[in-house]
Amino acid sequence: KWDMNRIFSDYYSKNLPPERQGEMAHRYVCGLYHCMRELTKRFPDILFEGCSAGGNRFDLGILCYFPQIWASDNTDALCRTQIQYNYSYGYPLSCISAHVSASPNHQTLRNMPLETRFAVAAFGNLGYEFNLCDLPKDEFMAVKAQIELYKKWREVIQYGTFYRRECFDNRNSRNHGVLNNGAGNNAS
């Protein structure tokens, strides 16, 4: 994961005159793309994951180098419904990294069932963000079953046609689904 956890607040350079200070953000992006082009050329077998946090690097250009992007450092399942839903307006589910994290969530302290956390993370590039060795046997087996289910439906989820249904209470509800449009699903 290529991360830059830094907020851009100092868009200036001592080396540029005042009338050219507006170039800093653009120069940063050009430099980052150059760096990523070289890295992916030198190491074509490494899957680099980008990160939108800090440097706000989730755009169509960066997808040339990072086929998947960590959409937010916030891993709370309820918060992620909004984050992933909004990203889906501009990006395919296949590039949105989404993880099942521990409960209670370390950021919001919210308790969510494992099934809920999986259901949210499954609408993206699924991962798990906790130590599997720490799980009770029943949860470990549930995670194993979730991964098998995801693998069965991964192509449909990532490459099918994504539909959103607008809800009356848009603040607390998300309703969406994926239709198999010949995406190569081997599921029965």
Each model region followed by its residue ranges:
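Hydrophobic alpha-helix feature that most strongly marks membrane-spanning transmembrane helices
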Residues: S9, S13, R20, T40-L47, ...
